[in-house]
UniProtKB/Swiss-Prot annotation:
<keyword id="KW-0256">Endoplasmic reticulum</keyword>
<dbReference type="GO" id="GO:0005741">
    <property type="term" value="C:mitochondrial outer membrane"/>
</dbReference>
<dbReference type="GO" id="GO:0055091">
    <property type="term" value="P:phospholipid homeostasis"/>
</dbReference>
<dbReference type="GO" id="GO:0007005">
    <property type="term" value="P:mitochondrion organization"/>
</dbReference>
<dbReference type="GO" id="GO:0015917">
    <property type="term" value="P:aminophospholipid transport"/>
</dbReference>
<protein>
    <recommendedName>
        <fullName>Mitochondrial distribution and morphology protein 12</fullName>
    </recommendedName>
</protein>
<comment type="similarity">
    <text>Belongs to the MDM12 family.</text>
</comment>
<dbReference type="GO" id="GO:0005886">
    <property type="term" value="C:plasma membrane"/>
</dbReference>
<keyword id="KW-0472">Membrane</keyword>
<dbReference type="GO" id="GO:0032865">
    <property type="term" value="C:ERMES complex"/>
</dbReference>
<keyword id="KW-1000">Mitochondrion outer membrane</keyword>
<dbReference type="GO" id="GO:0045040">
    <property type="term" value="P:protein insertion into mitochondrial outer membrane"/>
</dbReference>
<keyword id="KW-0445">Lipid transport</keyword>
<dbReference type="GO" id="GO:0007031">
    <property type="term" value="P:peroxisome organization"/>
</dbReference>
<dbReference type="GO" id="GO:0000002">
    <property type="term" value="P:mitochondrial genome maintenance"/>
</dbReference>
<dbReference type="GO" id="GO:0005739">
    <property type="term" value="C:mitochondrion"/>
</dbReference>
<dbReference type="GO" id="GO:0120013">
    <property type="term" value="F:lipid transfer activity"/>
</dbReference>
Amino acid sequence: MSFDINWSTLESDNRLNDLIRKHLNSYLQNTQLPSYVSNLRVLDFDLGKVGPAITLKEITDPLDEFYDSIREEADQETEENNDNKEDSEHICPDRTIANHEGPKDDFEAPVVMPSPNDIQFLLEVEYKGDLLVTIGADLVLNYPVEKFMTLPVKLSISDIGLHSLCIVACLSKQLFLSFLCDVSDPALDDNQTVLDPKGPILAATKPLERISIVRSMKIETEIGEQYQGQGSVLRSVGELEQFLFTIFKDFLRKELAWPSWINLDFNDGDE
């Protein structure tokens, strides 16, 4: 069973686009960069106007791992609250006698039990939309000496294609999303990932891995005209594009591919 989503609501949400951009930048800050690139950052993120095609395959109870995650988070919050409580007692010794009456004043972790309203969807997601990621970087030329020249470049990632199975679990006011595996798709399997229309071409991964999430994409690079004919610059640009393609795929697999997931917690809205 297929259904439509109101993609325009997400696409027009600047806060969501900015949140994703910040999350990507946080990941890049913890990524070891090669010697030929520095100051790698996401300048802009746009979900685009074309949403994914989604087909509902199955409805089940949520996986136990999601409940375990909520319990672990609740236990951690309880432990932190009790630690803060102990710190405040040390600061205010006049309250020590009252607080020694018993453990009744300690914070207790809430009991997490499955609810009849909890539900999980197995979805087939196909995306060939107009999402656009704009990235800035400094290309470092280390010849004839180290850091001989630094060249600012701007790269655009577009034409992203994916076709995967994923699970979406709704537990109380929390939503979990995780990708399970890729779906065979001739349009993507036979496609090529273009790193630069005038540069090298990297063929899409074959044979099909269990999960790549991103199966095709295009990266275009803008550099100053005075550098476009220099072989060393073009080689470095090609290496940078391949590096971006790799870390972009790795980011999605580490963050979204099972046994990893993203968790959207809407409980804070009650405060």
